[in-house]
A protein has these predicted regions:
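Intrinsic disorder/low-complexity segments
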Residues: 1-42
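RNA-interacting cores
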Residues: 40-237
């Protein structure tokens, strides 16, 4: 994909499907879990392909030093990832603003403007990755404990998994969290399967095994979806 046709939402969604079709909205939009319903065609309403170039991975680390993270750790992980990626993968001779189009750092972390995207995100396309941390999780992890988070890759970014994993390994080796004191070693990488389970594809720095990195879509779709908001959502338009 030359650009990533994705919409980044500041809300986590959980879908449940039912058989009957109607539209309903329950409750006012507040900071709490709240369901609402949307209508779907029983066939393929968007004429989607059989597969989408999306893969979800889980990165496991073994901590060598105590790690202290804020309640919502994804922002912290994104920050250390960006700094480590810039140091490891930027191919520009001098700092560029914006980076050159073929710079791996730019392709992953700061995508160039793309005319094929909607106007609201044309100049600043969403990056082709998402970092997902548990909504409810401890903030302190002692040395010797494990720490894991999910990484969703879109389009061509899936083929950069070895680079991205190596960059996260460098970030954890250097330190993150409070005072950059938390350190750890990458102990495993797993990919999510169609049934929701995770399959280990690398352990302790071993080469990443070949694996399916697509989402396969169903041939038929239910007529109703129930969406449960797990984080606050503000609908502007």
């Amino acid at each position: 994909l030359s650009c990533v046709p994705t919409l980044c939402l500041n809300a986590a969604l959980r879908l449940q499907f039912a058989d009957t079709a109607h539209f309903a909205f329950s409750g006012r939009l507040k900071r709490r879990i709240m369901p609402f319903f949307i209508c779907l065609s029983a066939m393929n309403p968007l004429n989607l392909p059989q597969e989408l170039p999306i893969a979800r991975y889980r990165l496991h680390f073994t901590l060598t030093h105590d790690l202290q993270l804020p309640p919502y750790a994804a922002s912290t992980l994104r920050g250390v990832f960006g700094h480590a990626l810039l140091a490891a993968a930027c191919t520009c001779d001098t700092p560029q603003t914006p980076h050159l189009p073929d710079c791996p750092y730019a392709q992953i972390f700061e995508p160039a403007p793309c005319a094929d995207l909607p106007g609201s995100i044309r100049q600043s396309p969403p990056p082709p990755y998402l970092i997902e941390t548990p909504l409810v999780a401890p903030t302190h992890f002692p040395a010797g404990a494990g720490y894991a988070f999910d990484l969703v890759l879109f389009g061509r970014a899936r083929h950069s998994l070895p680079l991205i994993a190596a960059v996260f390994a460098q970030a954890f080796a250097k330190g993150l969290g409070a005072n950059n004191a938390g350190k750890g070693e990458l102990s495993g990488i797993a990919v999510q399967q169609a049934d929701g389970s995770f399959l280990t594809i690398s352990e302790r720095g071993s080469p990443i095994a070949l694996h399916d990195n697509h989402i396969r879509l169903p041939e038929r779709y239910p007529t109703q979806a129930r969406i449960q908001l797990l984080t606050p959502l503000r609908i502007q338009q």
